């Protein structure tokens, strides 16, 4: 029986081969077609970057962004593949650019006014098609931007000088509130409280608990940064989102109470002409049916968190740089004495504070806080010879560009880098074009007011061995010091105003 089974005469070999060959041929053809598809996909892009390799490339690049943070991942990829390269984020083709000519092209054209990020993540924090910062609906973004532009320029900018100077003086008079037992100053907390107080006085005008709101703002920012590029599956696992949900809710609930108080005051006021601020304008727009209630609340929230979130960290880095460079401090103090003297700072002083302005610019170049810009192409285009398809994500790596082009000593902190006029295409800390930072002018003026008011009263020092270069930092959506790992306090020594130039 066994021999019969093994005997080939019992089988029609020809028929067996004819059945097997088509199946094998189909399998080979399918495999060949698949490999050609993958090969063709990779060949369609002449832009440098990691390999697609059966979809593994996009998975790895997205994981790298989640693991390293957006800013650190951008620096890694630009260093690896050049100043114009391609990766994938959330499965979407994403360009990372640190070349000035390409950045200039993206920023100046209106078909790059949209940003990108996880829709579910932005919905989670309330920014999806609301507010201004990450509102990716061009029509809705255009509807709210004029409110921000009006509030951050003209009379609002002039009022800010006095309000900000008064806030700094008030907080410096209560410096013990942000000092530890050794008398060291928690500069980040101090700056965040000053920025929040100034923003509130300018844009909302409702008394609030600074210390509590500052903590809630930090929690909200952490959630925003953590969720911006998370894959959709993350939001289906409730326990992963719970911590962020609480942080977002804490700030939104606190803001809701403040905004409701604002609405009440508006509805009961006999006269509003002399006190129409940013929040009032938005609430009137809501009453006219131009904006939704949720959008109004988000706009006010974003206006109040912007300065405590970024400008406070910028000034923190500046004070560390001043402490390390006494010759810069001397030049600043000399200019303050010449331009301002012993009187209060005024709006007409701003153009005369050239050393202070150069110092601010060099600080933002050397140690940026916002060192990237995220955009999305709304139509097909060509950038520096590379084809860019509609829907492509783009990250402009400003921090890297500021150390690659034009500046004579790009890797050093020195005011020589701004001794001559810098063409604006080579230095863009706030961006430019239709989606430039709406607060770029008021931010510069506010930083001048902070530095002048603080430095005329105090000489600043870091703790031994502390400096910006050695500080542990997190470079994600923005670049912040790691507050869990470093001693970030400073020593404030009161100046003798009559002898401040002798130091």
Curated annotation (Swiss-Prot):
The keyword Transmembrane applies. One of its GO terms (molecular function) is iron ion binding. Heme binds at residue 437. Its main location: endoplasmic reticulum. Belongs to the cytochrome P450 family. A cytochrome P450 monooxygenase that catalyzes the conversion of C19 androgens, androst-4-ene-3,17-dione (androstenedione) and testosterone to the C18 estrogens, estrone and estradiol, respectively. Catalyzes three successive oxidations of C19 androgens: two conventional oxidations at C19 yielding 19-hydroxy and 19-oxo/19-aldehyde derivatives, followed by a third oxidative aromatization step that involves C1-beta hydrogen abstraction combined with cleavage of the C10-C19 bond to yield a phenolic A ring and formic acid. This is Aromatase. It comes from Bos taurus. The gene is CYP19A1.
């Amino acid at each position: 029986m066994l021999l019969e089974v093994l005997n080939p005469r019992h089988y029609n070999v020809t028929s067996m081969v004819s059945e097997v060959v088509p199946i094998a041929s189909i399998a080979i053809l399918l495999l060949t077609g698949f490999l050609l598809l993958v090969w063709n996909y990779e060949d369609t892009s002449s832009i440098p970057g990691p390999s697609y390799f059966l979809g593994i490339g996009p998975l790895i690049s997205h994981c790298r962004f989640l693991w390293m943070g957006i800013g650190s991942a951008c620096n890694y990829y630009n260093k690896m593949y050049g100043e114009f390269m391609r990766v994938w984020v959330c499965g979407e083709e994403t360009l990372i650019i640190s070349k000035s000519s390409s950045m200039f092209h993206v920023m100046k054209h209106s078909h790059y006014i949209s940003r990108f990020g996880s829709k579910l993540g932005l919905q989670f924090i309330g920014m999806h098609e609301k507010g201004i910062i990450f509102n990716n609906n061009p029509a809705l973004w255009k509807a709210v931007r004029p409110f921000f532009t009006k509030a951050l320029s003209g009379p609002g900018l002039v009022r800010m000088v006095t309000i900000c100077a008064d806030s700094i003086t008030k907080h410096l008079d209560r410096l013990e509130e942000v000092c530890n037992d050794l008398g060291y100053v928690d500069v980040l907390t101090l700056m965040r409280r000053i920025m929040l107080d100034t923003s509130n006085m300018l844009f909302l005008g409702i008394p609030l608990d600074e210390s509590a709101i500052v903590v809630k703002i930090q929690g909200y920012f952490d959630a925003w940064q953590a969720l911006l590029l998370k894959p959709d599956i993350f939001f289906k696992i409730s326990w992963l989102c719970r911590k962020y949900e609480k942080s977002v809710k804490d700030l939104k609930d606190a803001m809701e109470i403040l905004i409701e108080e604002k609405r009440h005051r508006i509805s009961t006021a006999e006269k509003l002409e002399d006190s129409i601020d940013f929040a009032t304008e938005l609430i009137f727009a809501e009453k006219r049916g131009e904006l939704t209630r949720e959008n109004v609340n988000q706009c006010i929230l974003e206006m109040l968190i912007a300065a405590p979130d970024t400008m406070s960290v910028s000034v923190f880095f500046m004070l560390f740089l001043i402490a390390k460079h006494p010759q810069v401090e001397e030049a600043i103090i000399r200019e303050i004495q010449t331009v301002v003297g012993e009187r209060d700072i005024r709006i007409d002083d701003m153009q005369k504070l050239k050393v202070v302005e150069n110092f601010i610019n060099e600080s933002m170049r050397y140690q940026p806080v916002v060192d990237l810009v995220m955009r999305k192409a709304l139509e097909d285009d060509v950038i520096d010879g590379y084809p860019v398809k509609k829907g492509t994500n783009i990250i402009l790596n400003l921090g890297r560009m500021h150390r690659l082009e034009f500046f004579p000593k790009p890797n050093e902190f020195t005011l020589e880098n701004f001794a001559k006029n810098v063409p604006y295409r080579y230095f863009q800390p706030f961006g430019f074009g239709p989606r430039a930072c709406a607060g770029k002018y008021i931010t510069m003026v506010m930083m001048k007011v902070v530095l002048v008011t603080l430095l005329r009263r105090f000489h600043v020092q870091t703790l031994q061995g502390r400096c910006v270069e050695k500080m542990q930092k997190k470079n994600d959506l923005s670049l912040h010091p790691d507050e869990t790992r470093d001693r970030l306090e400073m020593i404030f020594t009161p100046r003798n105003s009559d002898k401040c130039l002798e130091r």
